Regions:
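Aromatic- and glycine-rich beta-strand/loop motifs that create alpha-glucan
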Residues: 1-24
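Helix-loop-helix units of permease transmembrane domains in multi-pass membrane transporters
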Residues: 71-105
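Terminal transmembrane helical anchor/hairpin motif
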Residues: 34-49, 168, 176-249
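A residue-level signal for alpha-helical anchor/packing sites in multi-pass solute transporters
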Residues: 73, 82-85, 120, 156, ...
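Helix-capping/transition residues at the boundaries of transmembrane alpha-helices
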Residues: 10, 75, 87, 158-159
């Protein structure tokens, strides 16, 4: 717990709040522009339309955002060359766990606030039908779980490389692959970690080529995909932790 508190104390001047505010602003702007182009017929499916497009926005924005947060958490020790000093006070495993816990809490707060903002957007735009509270809660949980899988990967890279450009390049590539993977067959998406934002979406889309009508419908993530997400997370966590423990300081 002391190490976790130390992480928050250390990051108080790392502009984490500004980074999170920028993420929310970009998502709000993106979705605002999207909804401004929809007609009344489209808005009848407003809640499903919102969650469907949020999955796409997550696939584009969150990989780089997660990489940025992980980098901000780890770069100070690299710049100050303080790893050896820290490891005299705590084991590498505990240091790794503290940073992972910090990332989990920051992402949880960020995504809960994001869900609250978009619930407010739905109310302001007067979406038809009752508010899908359960779906929003599950969507937030899924976004957090996928983001934590990506965070485990990014933290491993940020801890291993002193130059944070390597980790950020991975984040940029993840954003590109995240949205590109939504065009892949589902079997192929499962091999793209960043593709799980779209793979585990709660809303599907059906476009009728004859009538040219788009229909959205509720769907549930497959249990096999949930299991694969947990496997990816475990791999990134265990490998990242092992490399950090063996890293020479």
């Amino acid at each position: 717990m002391k190490l976790l508190k130390l992480e928050f104390f250390k990051c108080r001047r790392r502009k984490i709040v500004l980074v999170c505010a920028a993420i929310l602003a970009v998502e709000l702007l993106w979705m605002g522009v999207f909804f401004a182009r929809q007609d009344a017929e489209d808005m009848k499916q407003g809640w499903m339309l919102l969650l469907y497009n949020l999955s796409m926005v997550d696939a584009i924005i969150l990989p780089l955002s997660v990489a940025t947060l992980a980098s901000r958490s780890c770069e100070l020790e690299h710049k100050g060359n303080t790893w050896k000093l820290l490891e005299t006070m705590a084991s590498p495993v505990r240091l790794y766990a503290a940073k992972l816990g910090w990332g989990a809490l920051v992402l949880a707060v960020l995504l809960v606030i994001r869900s609250g903002l978009f619930l407010a957007v739905g109310l302001v735009l007067n979406f038809s039908g009752p508010i899908p509270w359960g779906r929003f809660a599950l969507f937030t949980l899924i976004s957090w779980a996928v983001s934590m899988m990506v965070y485990a990967l990014q933290q491993g890279l940020s801890l291993w490389f002193a130059n944070q450009a390597a980790a950020l390049v991975c984040g940029i590539s993840g954003s590109f692959l995240g949205i590109l993977s939504m065009l892949f067959p589902p079997a192929l998406i499962r091999f793209v970690p960043w593709g799980y934002y779209g793979l585990m979406a709660l809303v599907g889309m059906d476009w009728n080529e004859t009538t040219r009508v788009t229909r959205f419908y509720w769907c549930w993530p497959r249990l096999s995909d949930v299991a694969l997400l947990l496997i990816w997370s475990a791999i990134f966590l265990l490998v990242g932790r092992a490399l950090f423990v063996k890293k020479e300081v």
